[in-house]
Amino acid sequence: MDKVMRMSSEKGVVIFTKSSCCLCYAVQILFRDLRVQPTIHEIDNDPDCREIEKALVRLGCANAVPAVFVSGKLVGSTNDVMSLHLSGSLVPLIKPYQSFHN
């Protein structure tokens, strides 16, 4: 779990993904459309993939990926992110990390 916490706090917006996950891709596109360039960790390319998945679930992700962290805090998985976006709560959360240049 230490590795996940360290990785999740390296940058403002961090997303743990798997290269074959279509929901991971959708979440990445949402953040890019909102002018945020998240740090992406494709865990299937990490030798500690299993341990990372277990740690993400222990932290509260319903599914291990995608797992979105903002300011080092777990936002959640796809449903959590989409719910925040639809309620208008996501943009204020990520505002410090938005770029006005795309």
Swiss-Prot record:
TM helices/strands, residue ranges: none
Domain Glutaredoxin: residue ranges: 1-101
Disulphide-bridged cysteine pairs: 21-24
Subcellular location: Cytoplasm
Short name of one Pfam family: Glutaredoxin
Keywords assigned by UniProt, alphabetized: Cytoplasm, Disulfide bond, Electron transport, Redox-active center, Transport
Main location: cytoplasm
A GO CC annotation given for this chain: cytoplasm
CDD domains: GRX_GRXh_1_2_like
InterPro entries cross-referenced by the UniProt entry: GlrX-like_pln_2, Glutaredoxin, Glutaredoxin_subgr, Thioredoxin-like_sf
NCBIfam families given in the database record: GlrX-like_plant
Membership in a protein family: Belongs to the glutaredoxin family. CC-type subfamily.
Role: Has a glutathione-disulfide oxidoreductase activity in the presence of NADPH and glutathione reductase. Reduces low molecular weight disulfides and proteins.
Protein name, per record: Glutaredoxin-C14
Source organism per UniProt: Arabidopsis thaliana
